[in-house]
Amino acid sequence: MPIEMRSFARSVMNDDERREVEAMEMLADHLRDELVEREVAINQAHVVGAQSTAIQAIVAEVLTDELDFGQEVVLTPQDGIVTRARPDFVFQLSPGRGVMAEVERGGTVNNNHDLKDMWKAYISQDIQHLFLVVPNSNWTGVGGAREKPYPRVINRVGAFFGTPRRESGRPVGPRLRVRAGQPASCG
């Protein structure tokens, strides 16, 4: 299956935010191109019972080695919020501005990992952008598709964008811009 990518951004942005989103486009396009190059390895790693760390290791080759993302970085804590958010990958755009990348697999939708990642990015003062890497399909033991996380993630994440009312609530900075690119699935 092809490696697809979908982007969501706030409906209203100023010029600085637009420029930052353009920089995210370039990062995301590079990530997608590199994942396409690794499609065979991704398909071999994305099998029944595999851990998300198998896919994460492949994505890490691109994010850490080529794009200079940090791995498992603890984000700046905020007053009143009890969390030690530690995304899979983080890239600092400038002081206090960044993008985090999360790789999900089996629990993407069933365990709400996609929404947890949105929440983590939303409450993190250092993060304004989120790349989600999710599978097209997860498989049963006999090789059939058990679920299709990618289209469900697109629908769920897309619900947070499209109108200023749905995008409101964050006091500073642009709302999240989500890249949901997924590993191609096997089968």
Residue ranges and their predicted role:
Residues 45-49, 57-95, 108-116, 123:
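Active-site metal-binding core of divalent-cation-utilizing nuclease and nuclease-like domains
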Residues 130-136:
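Acidic beta-strand-to-loop metal/phosphate-binding motif
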Residues 136-187:
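Domain-level recognition of nuclease-like catalytic cores that cleave nucleotide substrates
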Residues 100-103, 107-117, 142:
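Active-site-adjacent loop/helix micro-motif of nuclease/hydrolase catalytic cores
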Residues 51-55, 113, 149-156:
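Soluble or luminal CAZymes and related metallo-dependent hydrolases
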Residues 121-123, 165:
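N-terminal cationic-hydrophobic initiation segments that often serve targeting/anchoring roles
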Residues 1-77:
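Interdomain/boundary linker segments immediately adjacent to catalytic/signaling cores
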